[in-house]
Swiss-Prot record:
Catalytic activity: cytidine(1402) in 16S rRNA + S-adenosyl-L-methionine = N(4)-methylcytidine(1402) in 16S rRNA + S-adenosyl-L-homocysteine + H(+)
Cellular localization per UniProt: Cytoplasm
Similarity comment: Belongs to the methyltransferase superfamily. RsmH family.
EC number per UniProt: 2.1.1.199
Gene giving rise to this polypeptide: rsmH
Recorded GO CC terms: cytoplasm
Function: Specifically methylates the N4 position of cytidine in position 1402 (C1402) of 16S rRNA.
Name of this protein: Ribosomal RNA small subunit methyltransferase H
SUPFAM superfamilies for the chain: Putative methyltransferase TM0872, insert domain (SSF81799), S-adenosyl-L-methionine-dependent methyltransferases (SSF53335)
Organism field: Leptothrix cholodnii (strain ATCC 51168 / LMG 8142 / SP-6)
GO process annotations (BP): rRNA base methylation
Length: 325
């Protein structure tokens, strides 16, 4: 277990040029970076924009905002603004900024290298630190707080469904047993050791704690709900011809993105009415891109990334019961 001694990090933006190349089709347009991180995508987007272009960025992590405003990666550009929000809340940010429709929206899901490599954030089993895992430490329940109070069945469900861990039952039992001894799990090293004892087989090249840590992070940050809500709201805010670019890092997120694009970009016929005209398509699938060998060699964390790109058509959104369908 690595301690909290200063571990230098170098954040490498995954699929940087591929995402921005696909996203920016109108240099004078208005764009949203829904997951600013350390600003890699935002910087390149700004390079591609005309003087009349505009980029709005949001991030839920206060450290990302502080870095964007005054840190080493500060962006000083009149076309740029950054706001503290979850990406599912982006519509309120646009409303406050007086923006109606977007020419492009980028989501880079998952966590950044600075978050992973900071022991105090509690995201990684490689470092000993408080078991927090919140992307926004100012609100919500930490992973330790969840494990200290959740019943066995709920812990098992989270580890099984969000971590796709086949030893979820054993992991949950070990966590609850320790809690009943009066020693609730409070640190990353404690959880990693507990999971290592509960997971009976090893996956090649993967720490036994990987799936459990992923599951808790997804739960604590409501990551899957964020993706679903953000995508549905993006559909209403993208201008005709506007692009949606989403980078996912695990199968649960990517499945949501893939299903969303397919649902709105695939012709659907009602089998009960074989001669009926299919509903007009709201989106057009543009690309599915994975990192090349060179990028994966330089940045192993890019290995699981998938970029999916879709374009909004000019078909108006149907309105159902006072809201968008």
């Amino acid at each position: 277990m690595i301690t909290a001694a200063a571990v230098p990090w170098q954040h490498r933006t995954v699929l940087l040029h591929e995402a921005v190349d696909a996203l920016v089709q109108r240099p004078a347009g208005v764009y949203l970076d829904g997951t600013y991180g350390r600003g890699g995508h935002s910087r390149l987007i700004l390079e591609r924009l005309d003087p009349a272009g505009r980029l709005i960025a949001i991030d839920r992590d206060p450290e990302a905002l502080a870095n964007a405003r005054s840190g080493e990666t500060r962006i000083d550009d009149p076309r740029f603004s950054i706001h503290h929000a979850r990406f599912a809340e982006f519509e309120s940010v646009l409303d406050e900024a007086g923006v109606g429709q977007l020419d492009g929206l980028l989501l880079d899901l998952g966590i950044s290298s600075p978050q992973i490599d900071n022991p105090e954030r509690g995201f990684s089993f490689r470092f000993d630190g408080p078991l927090d895992m919140r992307m926004d430490p100012t609100r919500g329940q930490s992973a330790a707080e969840f494990l200290a109070s959740a019943p066995f069945e709920r812990i098992k469900e989270v580890v099984r469904d969000y971590g796709e861990e086949r030893f979820a039952d054993a992991v949950a039992k070990a966590i609850v047993a320790r809690r009943e001894e009066g020693r609730p799990v409070q640190r990353t090293a404690e959880l990693a050791a507990l999971v290592a004892g509960a997971v009976k087989t090893r996956e090649r090249g993967q720490d036994p704690a990987t799936r459990t840590f992923q599951a808790l992070r997804i739960l604590v940050n409501a990551e899957l709900e964020e993706v679903e809500q953000g995508l549905n709201r993006a559909l209403a805010r993208l201008a005709p011809g506007g692009r949606l670019a989403v980078i996912a890092f695990h199968s649960l997120e990517d499945r949501i993105v893939k299903t969303f694009i397919a649902r709105h970009a695939r012709e659907v016929y009602d089998r009960r009415m074989p001669y009926a005209t299919p509903a007009p398509l709201l989106m057009r699938a543009v690309a599915r891109i994975k990192p090349g060998e060179a990028e994966v060699a330089a940045n192993p964390r890019a290995r699981s990334a998938i970029l999916r790109v879709a374009e909004r058509t000019d078909v108006p959104l149907p309105v159902v019961v006072g809201r968008y369908a």
